[in-house]
């Protein structure tokens, strides 16, 4: 009798787990990125130069030969990085750009670049580009803020 109850309980609990796993109503499109139309435009010369600086001789293998990564990088360059000057005094609680490690995985010759608002290369820094929340960094000794917007998901 105990064996019958034991096997019956195993059958019930294993079936319950399978049913709850299959009945997960959560949208399956939560991880699909929505890209604005401007990612259909080819890389500009400036964007290609920034990519070459960050990826060196691994640029084709790591980015250009991978269409999803091409779209991600275009989205980062064109839609997700905002740099502006803030006029308030109390910016000390915002993390500094100098606290972000330099991204040297593919090009170990990269040194800490001097900040230039017009030529800022976000790929030189090890930012978490896949965070679900907005990230803000302050450029050292300035009132410039770098905002990294999260990806837009469908």
Where are the language model's segments positioned?
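Short beta-strand and adjacent turn/loop elements
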Residues: 24-154
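Bacterial Sec-dependent N-terminal signal peptides
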Residues: 1-26
